[in-house]
């Protein structure tokens, strides 16, 4: 038996192997960390690095390239900077920063990278989206036409917000800015419980630079009220690095865009963009960028405009989804003419202005109706709201003017006294306790009681009690009237509502 292998056979096998050899050479752009300070790593050798590219260090910590020089790249670290040292290698990934998105994140508390921090296990999301993408163009949008109810009388009646709008909440510290945003999120439960999955409003709350105790309190309130099940909380607290505080709103916006681009509706609250601008200023100064006004870098306007422009009401061809933004700005001593407040005011579609003076007088929410405005929301109001609330803002303006005049102690004619009396009752009607949102029909019924003059004979101190009794009467004995108010506020419904109001007011005489 001949076991020898012929040379020809060997040659054939070698030729076959050479022909089938798949030489896949992958060239990586690798650099070396030459210095690290305050969360910024200076890396030498990343010649092919691109601005915004994700870089991975030796120990698996990631970073983003936010500065490019001749020989070095400045990389902002996302993670424990102490685990990155001089001499470590840094490798370009060729990717942009992305985060997990989808329904799996609902009810969870995550950090700026989408990692869960609530101790409830991993987030099993299969979809990831880049944190920074271009805002929808002109053709991809349509005008704001659907209302987004906050459940707060003074806002829904006088400063209405529509789906796809950017409405700024601005005011000094401790004036109730976060309270309005949280009430709006809680109010969506009234809406979500009665509509299909496609029509639900999903919510995202972004905490930037806040105390962890305050974030925990908000999460607990959302959980107790049943709102956490349709809400994502993205937290970058005061103890987190500036890189996380900078990235958090963009990451949250990407999560919201998942709902918007799939024909659904999402509400996102940025709390707050003042701290976001401060974090970006700190990061920019560490990156050796030249400072401008108030030491902010020159592109601080673009920082917020590219974020807020991603909120939109999409066209029917794009699924008709929406992303509504409620950015929050904290002012110092009521100064709305500072750099960041004026920037965000010019970007947004209106502002809800909260004043300390009004707050300390006991008027909550402390909204200054005269300075607050909604530039596009009125187009989204339902007919019953337009009928009832159309004249309220004008009558309140007349009331404030006469109130200033009356302080001088001059004699007031009968008409002016009537305007003052009705104005005081109207202001009392617009007061509302925190965490007690009202449906649109309930708001219309309450405001109608004030505008129709039915409360003129009730003392101002009893207006709050009257409101409680009216809402109780409507919900217990006349639920069909409330549904008719929402659908079509006809003269018949109006007459029936007047009878109910008269019945309630009679108990105060």
UniProtKB/Swiss-Prot annotation:
It is found in: Cell inner membrane. ATP binds at residues 171-178. Transmembrane segments: none annotated. The record marks 372 as: Required for activity. It catalyses: ATP + H2O + 4 H(+)(in) = ADP + phosphate + 5 H(+)(out). It comes from the Bacteria. The keyword Iron does not apply. It holds the Pfam family ATP-synt_ab. GO terms for cellular component: plasma membrane; proton-transporting ATP synthase complex. It is an enzyme of class 7 (translocase). One of its GO terms (molecular function) is ADP binding. Keywords: ATP synthesis, ATP-binding, Cell inner membrane, Cell membrane, CF(1), Hydrogen ion transport, Ion transport, Membrane, Nucleotide-binding, Translocase, Transport. Coiled coil: none annotated. Gene3D superfamilies: 2.40.30.20, ATP synthase alpha/beta chain, C-terminal domain (1.20.150.20), P-loop containing nucleotide triphosphate hydrolases (3.40.50.300). Its main location: membrane. InterPro entries: ATP_synth_asu-like_sf, ATP_synth_asu_C, ATP_synth_asu_C_sf, ATP_synth_F1_a_nt-bd_dom, ATP_synth_F1_asu, ATPase_a/bsu_AS, ATPase_F1/V1/A1_a/bsu_N, ATPase_F1/V1/A1_a/bsu_N_sf. Its EC number is 7.1.2.2. It is a peripheral membrane protein. Belongs to the ATPase alpha/beta chains family. F-type ATPases have 2 components, CF(1) - the catalytic core - and CF(0) - the membrane proton channel. CF(1) has five subunits: alpha(3), beta(3), gamma(1), delta(1), epsilon(1). CF(0) has three main subunits: a(1), b(2) and c(9-12). The alpha and beta chains form an alternating ring which encloses part of the gamma chain. CF(1) is attached to CF(0) by a central stalk formed by the gamma and epsilon chains, while a peripheral stalk is formed by the delta and b chains. Produces ATP from ADP in the presence of a proton gradient across the membrane. The alpha chain is a regulatory subunit. This is ATP synthase subunit alpha. The lineage of its organism: Bacteria, Pseudomonadati, Pseudomonadota, Alphaproteobacteria, Rickettsiales.
């Amino acid at each position: 038996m001949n076991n020898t292998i012929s040379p020809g056979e060997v040659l054939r096998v070698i030729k076959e192997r050479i022909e089938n050899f798949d030489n896949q050479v992958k060239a990586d752009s690798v650099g070396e960390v030459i210095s690290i300070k305050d969360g910024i790593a200076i890396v030498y050798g990343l010649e092919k690095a691109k601005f915004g590219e994700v870089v991975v260090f030796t120990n698996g910590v990631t970073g983003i390239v936010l500065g490019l020089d001749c020989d070095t790249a400045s990389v902002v670290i996302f993670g424990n900077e102490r685990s990155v040292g001089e001499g470590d290698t840094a490798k370009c990934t060729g990717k942009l920063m992305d985060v997990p998105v989808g329904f799996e994140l609902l009810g969870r508390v995550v950090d700026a990278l989408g990692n869960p921090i609530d101790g409830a296990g991993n987030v099993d999301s299969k979809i990831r989206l880049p944190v920074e993408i271009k805002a929808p163009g002109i053709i991809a949008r349509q005008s704001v036409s659907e209302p987004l109810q906050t459940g707060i009388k003074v806002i829904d009646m006088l400063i209405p917000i529509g789906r796809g709008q950017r409405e700024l909440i601005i005011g000094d510290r401790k004036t109730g800015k976060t309270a309005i945003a949280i009430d709006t999120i809680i109010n969506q439960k009234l809406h979500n419980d009665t509509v299909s999955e496609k029509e639900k409003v999903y919510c995202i709350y972004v905490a930037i630079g806040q105390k962890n105790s305050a974030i925990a309190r908000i999460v607990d309130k959302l959980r107790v009220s049943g709102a956490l099940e349709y809400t994502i909380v993205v937290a970058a607290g005061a103890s987190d690095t500036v890189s996380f505080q900078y990235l958090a709103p963009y990451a949250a916006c990407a999560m919201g865009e998942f709902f918007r681009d799939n024909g659904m509706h999402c509400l996102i609250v940025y709390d707050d963009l003042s701290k976001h601008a401060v974090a970006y200023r700190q990061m920019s100064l560490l990156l050796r960028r030249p400072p401008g006004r108030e030491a902010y870098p020159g592109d601080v306007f673009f920082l917020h405009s590219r974020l807020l422009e991603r909120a939109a009401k999409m066209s029917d061809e794009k699924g008709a989804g929406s992303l509504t933004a409620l950015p929050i700005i904290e002012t110092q001593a009521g100064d709305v003419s500072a750099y960041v407040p004026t920037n965000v005011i010019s970007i947004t579609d209106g502002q809800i202005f909260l004043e300390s003076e009004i707050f300390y007088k006991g008027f909550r929410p402390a909204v200054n109706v005269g300075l607050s405005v909604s530039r596009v929301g009125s187009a989204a109001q339902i007919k019953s709201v337009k009928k009832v609330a159309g004249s309220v803002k004008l009558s309140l303006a007349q009331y404030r003017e006469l109130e200033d005049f009356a302080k001088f102690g001059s004699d007031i004619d009968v008409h002016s006294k009537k305007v003052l009396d009705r104005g005081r009752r109207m202001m009392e009607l617009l007061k509302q306790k925190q965490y007690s949102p009202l449906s649109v029909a309930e708001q219309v019924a309450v405001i109608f009681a004030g505008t129709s003059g039915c409360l003129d004979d009730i003392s101002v101190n009893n207006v709050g009690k009257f409101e409680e009794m009216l809402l109780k009467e409507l919900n217990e004995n006349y639920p069909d009237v409330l549904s008719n108010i929402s659908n079509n506020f006809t003269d018949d419904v109006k007459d029936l509502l007047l009878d109910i109001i008269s019945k309630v007011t009679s108990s105060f005489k």
